[in-house]
Amino acid sequence: MENKLIWLDLEMTGLEPQSERIIEIFTAITNEDLTEVIEGPNIVISQPTEYLDNMDDWNQDHHSRSGLLDEVKKSEISQEDAELRTLNFIKEHVGKNKSPLCGNTIHHDRKFLTLYMPQLEEYFHYRNIDVSSLKEVAKRWRPEVTMDCLLYTSPSPRDVEESRMPSSA
């Protein structure tokens, strides 16, 4: 169980945790070398239509084109159930407070977790591995390095895979 990393990606109706909601959660667990992957559940969460109707243009377009918006409207999975399913998956593979939370701009996802999935958020170590920060550093210090490996078609798993699998140009 030691040294495993928990990778997480959320899709939300917008960027403001106080007024927006989580509509999809994906989790994967890797070994410390990022060579072994255990994919967790990719859960589309039902949300009241008021949150979907009030999404800004970017989110409306992005989630419509990906098909996620239609999936959210059909989903019968509550936020609480999604939290429990995700937490149960993680508990099978990683002990409490043993892994930092890993992903792209993960500090922002963590804000949503704190509000809407507090049991899950408390399970992670307080540290983060934020791949967005690494990308910004690489862009400035090693611009020849690219991180554009797209191996999945679903939005959340793709984001996690991009975080996990940087490639060199």
Question: Language-model segments: what does each one mean?
Answer:
Residues 2-8, 12-103, 149-150:
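Conserved non-catalytic scaffold segment of RNase H-like nuclease domains
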Residues 165-169:
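Hydrophobic alpha-helical segments, chiefly the membrane-spanning helices
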Residues 152-159:
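Conserved small/polar residues in nucleotide/adenosyl-binding loops
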Residues 17, 111-113, 163-164:
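Short glycine-/acidic-enriched loop or helix-start segments at secondary-structure transitions
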Residues 143-151:
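Short helix/strand-capping connector loops at secondary-structure junctions
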Residues 78, 82-86, 109, 116, ...:
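Amphipathic alpha-helical interface surfaces
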Residues 108-126:
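Substrate-recognition/cap helix-loop segment adjacent to the acidic, metal-dependent catalytic center
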Residues 127-142:
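Short, flexible loop segments at boundaries between secondary-structure elements
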